[in-house]
Design a protein with these regions (language model features):
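Short, glycine-biased loop/turn motifs at secondary-structure junctions and
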Residues: 1-112, 117, 121, 125-169
Length: 169
């Protein structure tokens, strides 16, 4: 019970911090009493705001969310290997390192110092949004899979399957 009260206090603190960064009224009204799943959903819905304002801060995420968000598509300072499965959206935050096999459509955001090793299979489409000092490594060398990159920062190594590269710097 104490843990839930602690988490709730931190989520209230997070809302106040979001408001101080200019969170829109709609998101403020919809805030409610979110659990981890709802916070992950809110992150993906408000990702542009989160990236623009570096919100929530990585330190807050590390202290309050690390290890609780993987099943909802958010990695925080973690290293894993996985297949896409049902996951359609992923975010790598902090110094995460993900090796993933993608078989369908997937939208992946990589931030901070995270690394994404992408194995793209035939017929799939992957959209990657790169920020900060992130690294994209496309492991696949050939095939009919397509990768579209919006590059706001970071570096690409082994980018042979990139179909479209939008420089946003």
């Amino acid at each position: 019970m104490h843990t839930n009260l602690y988490a709730m206090a931190n989520y209230d603190e997070l809302l106040k911090d979001g408001i101080s960064h200019g969170m829109c009224e709609k998101f403020q009204k919809e805030w409610g009493n979110p659990g981890v799943k709802e916070l992950c959903y809110k992150y993906f819905r408000g990702q542009d705001f989160c990236i623009e304002h570096n919100w929530p801060e990585l330190k807050w995420l590390e202290e309050n969310m690390r290890g609780k968000t993987i099943e909802y598509g958010i990695l925080i300072n973690q290293t894993i290997q996985m297949s896409q499965g049902e996951r359609r959206e992923l975010a790598l935050l902090g110094n995460s390192d993900l090796t993933i096999d993608v078989f369908d459509v997937c939208d992946i955001t990589i931030r901070h110092g995270s690394k994404l090793h992408l194995n793209v299979h035939d017929g799939c489409f992957v959209y990657v949004s790169m920020h900060d000092d992130s690294v994209l490594d496309i492991v696949s060398k050939e095939g009919t899979g397509r990768v579209c990159v919006s590059h706001f920062g970071g570096s690409v190594i082994n980018g042979g399957l990139i179909d479209k590269f939008n420089e946003k710097l």
